[in-house]
């Protein structure tokens, strides 16, 4: 489970382009929270603080305790708008956490891909899925899904049915899919390559 980030925000009562510009001039970022059947809440965040946390790994799957006017809400980042030149955060969408489970997208970390057996024998480790969508218990939301692929041989594919997910998590789909393949040497078409092509065609 990822650590819970504590953030403070202020309610926002003025809207529109002019109000957003005024907030940014004051060093704050407009944001909104919605979802879970609740009334959307418009807020603002301290620009330097939210930009600092955004630049850390896996922010988009970070569980946050957001304090607004002395009330705490459990939320997840949904979308982040950046300045096109400076990469400073300009707007954030958050979603309220569901009471029991939450659908979310998390990054996949392939540990040992440079040392995989198939790579050592001349194969190429090809990533088909960099992120996966999970259904998670709100008390066990992972920052990522980490998979050890050091023993993955040449001409094989890594399928969802073989992945051990963090406790309280499951894939949103029961249909098996390919996450990665080790492609053989050029000119030797493999079963894994065929599965990779089928997976890409089904995207």
From Swiss-Prot:
InterPro entries assigned to the protein according to its UniProt record, in alphabetical order: Rbsml_bL25/Gln-tRNA_synth_N, Ribosomal_bL25/Gln-tRNA_synth, Ribosomal_bL25_b-dom, Ribosomal_bL25_C, Ribosomal_bL25_long, Ribosomal_bL25_short, Ribosomal_L25_dom, Ribosomal_uL5_bac-type
Pfam families recorded: Ribosomal_L25p, Ribosomal_TL5_C
Residues in the signal sequence: none
Keyword Ribonucleoprotein part of the UniProt annotation: yes
Keywords of the record: Ribonucleoprotein, Ribosomal protein, RNA-binding, rRNA-binding
GO CC field: cytosolic large ribosomal subunit
BP term (GO), one: translation
A GO molecular function held by the record: 5S rRNA binding
Domain of life: Bacteria
UniProt cross-references to Gene3D superfamilies, sorted A to Z: Ribosomal protein L25, beta domain, Ribosomal Protein L25, Chain P
Subunit field text: Part of the 50S ribosomal subunit; part of the 5S rRNA/L5/L18/L25 subcomplex. Contacts the 5S rRNA. Binds to the 5S rRNA independently of L5 and L18.
Job of this protein: This is one of the proteins that binds to the 5S RNA in the ribosome where it forms part of the central protuberance.
HAMAP family listed in its UniProt record: Ribosomal_bL25, Ribosomal_bL25_CTC
Xref: PANTHER family: RIBOSOMAL PROTEIN L25/GLN-TRNA SYNTHETASE, ANTI-CODON-BINDING DOMAIN-CONTAINING PROTEIN, RIBOSOMAL PROTEIN L25_GLN-TRNA SYNTHETASE, ANTI-CODON-BINDING DOMAIN-CONTAINING PROTEIN
Similarity field: Belongs to the bacterial ribosomal protein bL25 family. CTC subfamily.
Name of the protein in question: Large ribosomal subunit protein bL25
């Amino acid at each position: 489970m990822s650590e819970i980030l504590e953030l403070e925000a202020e309610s926002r009562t003025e809207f529109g382009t002019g109000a957003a510009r005024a907030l940014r001039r004051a060093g704050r970022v407009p944001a909104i929270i919605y979802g879970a059947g609740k009334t959307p809440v418009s807020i603002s965040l301290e620009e330097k603080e939210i930009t600092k946390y955004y630049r850390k790994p896996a922010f988009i799957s970070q569980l946050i305790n957001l304090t607004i006017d002395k009330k705490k809400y459990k939320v997840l980042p949904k979308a982040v708008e950046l300045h096109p030149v400076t990469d400073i955060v300009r707007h954030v969408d958050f979603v309220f956490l569901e009471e029991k489970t939450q659908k979310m997208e998390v990054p996949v970390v392939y540990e040992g891909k440079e040392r995989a057996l198939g790579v050592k024998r001349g194969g190429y480790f090809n990533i088909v899925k960099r992120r996966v969508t999970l259904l998670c218990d709100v008390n066990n939301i992972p920052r990522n899904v980490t998979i050890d692929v050091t023993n993955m041989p040449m001409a094989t594919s890594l399928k969802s049915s073989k992945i051990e997910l963090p406790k309280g998590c499951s894939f949103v789909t029961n249909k098996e899919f390919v996450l990665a393949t080790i492609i053989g040497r050029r000119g030797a078409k493999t079963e894994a390559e065929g599965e990779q092509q089928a997976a890409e065609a089904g995207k």
